[in-house]
Design a protein with these regions (language model features):
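Juxtamembrane/disordered regions of integral membrane proteins
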Residues: 1-142
C-alpha cells in the first residue's frame, strides 16, 4: 500500500472544489435562487446572500473537494483507481457533508420547505460526486 501523494491530493482537491463550487452556483445560485429567497424571507432574513457568505460557501466547497479527494486516495488501495472508486468517495462525502446536515437542519428542524431541502440535497449529490470524479482524474499515487 503506497503513501498518499500530497501534491496530487491538493491539486485534485482544488479541481474537485472548483467543480463543486461551479455546479453549486448553478444549482443554488441560479436554479434554486427564488426558492432560497422565499425560504430566507420566511425566516425573516435578507433574500440574498451577502458577499461574505458567498465567499464562505466557496471556501466550504474547496474544503469539501479536498476532503473528497483525501477519501478517494484513502480508499483507492482497497477499491482500485478509477471512476467507480471516485463515485464511492463522492457519495460518502455527500452523505456526511450534505445529506445528513440538510435532513437535520432543513427538514427535521423545519427551517425550509421540503421541496427546497429535497432539491438542494439532490443537487448536492451531483455537485459532490461530479467534483470528486473530476478531482480523482488528476490524482496519481506516484
Amino acid at each position: 500500500m503506497g503513501k498518499i501523494n500530497v501534491g496530487r491530493l491538493i491539486l485534485g482537491g482544488i479541481v474537485a472544489g472548483i467543480a463543486i463550487d461551479l455546479l453549486d452556483y448553478f444549482v443554488d445560485g441560479v436554479w434554486l435562487a427564488p426558492r432560497w429567497a422565499s425560504g430566507m424571507a420566511m425566516l425573516g432574513r435578507p433574500p440574498a446572500f451577502s458577499q461574505i457568505q458567498i465567499i464562505l460557501f466557496n471556501v466550504i466547497g474547496l474544503l469539501t473537494g479536498l476532503v473528497a479527494i483525501w477519501v478517494y486516495a484513502a480508499i483507492r488501495p482497497r477499491f482500485g483507481a478509477g471512476i467507480k472508486t471516485a463515485i464511492y468517495a463522492g457519495l460518502a462525502v455527500w452523505l456526511l457533508t450534505t445529506l445528513f446536515p440538510n435532513v437535520a437542519f432543513m427538514h427535521v428542524a423545519h427551517l425550509f420547505p421540503n421541496h427546497l431541502t429535497l432539491y438542494t440535497t439532490l443537487g448536492g449529490v451531483v455537485e459532490v460526486v461530479f467534483g470528486t470524479v473530476a478531482g480523482a482524474s488528476v490524482y496519481k499515487e506516484t
